[in-house]
Amino acid sequence: MAKSSVAEQPVSGEKYGFDAIRGTQAGREFYVAMCPWKIIPKLFIFNDYDIPPELRAQRTLRETRIPAIKDYILNNLTDYTFSSLTASVDGSMDFVPFPSSGKDGKLGRLYINMDSRLLINDGQHRRKAIEESLKENPGLGSEMISVVFFQDDGLKRSQQMFSD
């Protein structure tokens, strides 16, 4: 398992900070960060129970899929592969480029207000399988997964991100 310093750090008790890469799609900024598995269950929520199906930005979580993904992780500790989680942030995000990359730099630190809701648009089954895997093997907490963060532009945009 990869050993890495934790990428997330509470900042002033009000924000999370992540080393990130800034990109642009269709005129909108987005950010890619490496997140340790141990924070994934705490950071990301599901909206299945709070919102009627026709208003959800994501598919309903199918609990029957989780054991197979969890087993895939636990049975392939040195040889599993996961694609990125995609998340919407409904609060403030501030990106500060590293000084060495200049004011328009693409490498920097992403700060997300701790009061923000972070909603997974794609990857909720992976997220839940990570949570279940950690219960059986807490040592996986230092494993990393890439997360693509988008500003939450409302339900219609979130549904579009999930369907694409």
Predicted features and spans:
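N-terminal extension/subdomain marker
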Residues: 1-82, 90-99, 107-110
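Basic- and aromatic-enriched surface patches that contact anionic nucleotides/nucleic acids
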Residues: 77-93, 98-164
